[in-house]
Amino acid sequence: MKFYDLMCKAAQDVGLELSKEQYEKFIIYKNLLQEWNEKVNLTAITEDEDIIKKHFIDSIKAFKRDEFKEAKTLIDVGTGAGFPGIPVAIMNENIQVTLLDSLNKRVNFLNLVTEKLGLKNVVAIHSRAEDGARQKNLRESFDIATSRAVANMSVLSEFCLPYVKINGHFIALKGPAVEEEIKDSDKAITTLGGQLLDICEVEIEDTELKHNLVVVKKIKECPKVYPRKAGNVTKKPIK
């Protein structure tokens, strides 16, 4: 019951309630993650307690921003093993979640999780971020683009902002020290049609971890030249 209590507390902290049914979905998800991780490299975090805190609770804390409660559509860019997209879909079944990843094996895992958990509000797409943003049905189509991928804000902005509708939001789940990174990404955010709105600190229950939600509002259309071709985004970030 320790994990259930921890997750309930985390959910309450962001104005949500975790039902037993939702908790059971998280446990099935955890078991699948551990099982698949033995054959596909999904995560370096493999212990029960670490998965609960560093993956599940960390993802649930995104709901500290009301945008995650109010949005109808969300894309999780470079979702990997499904964070934060799948936890968001479990906690809010009214949001349509698109999971985007460049590795087909991970997409197969995500499809299995979606099926086993009975998530009707999730679809997984196999694509690089740069390529997906050129598709008409995906470009500037989402209320929220989010990412917990390990890349700096300049790179993430070019990966994510092209997916966001005007007046929608790009919300990055980042680590504890983001000030310098934000400063360096100012030009990228502006160039891509965004405006920095807020940096929101979150704490992870029963740990000393502190993370940040970096919130960028999409205020104008993203120029058609972005995102650039695969490789250019990471090699030559907009500065």
Curated annotation (Swiss-Prot):
Kindly give the Gene3D superfamilies that the UniProt entry links to this protein: Vaccinia Virus protein VP39
Q: Where is the signal peptide?
A: none
* EC number(s) reported in the record: 2.1.1.-
Does the keyword section mention S-adenosyl-L-methionine?
A: yes
**Residues the entry annotates as binding S-adenosyl-L-methionine:** 78, 83, 129-130, 148
Q: Name one Pfam family in it.
A: GidB
Output the superkingdom of the source species.
Answer: Bacteria
Q: What does this protein do?
A: Specifically methylates the N7 position of a guanine in 16S rRNA.
**Identification of the protein by name:** Ribosomal RNA small subunit methyltransferase G
Kindly list the organism's lineage: Bacteria, Bacillati, Bacillota, Clostridia, Eubacteriales
Q: Which gene encodes it?
A: rsmG
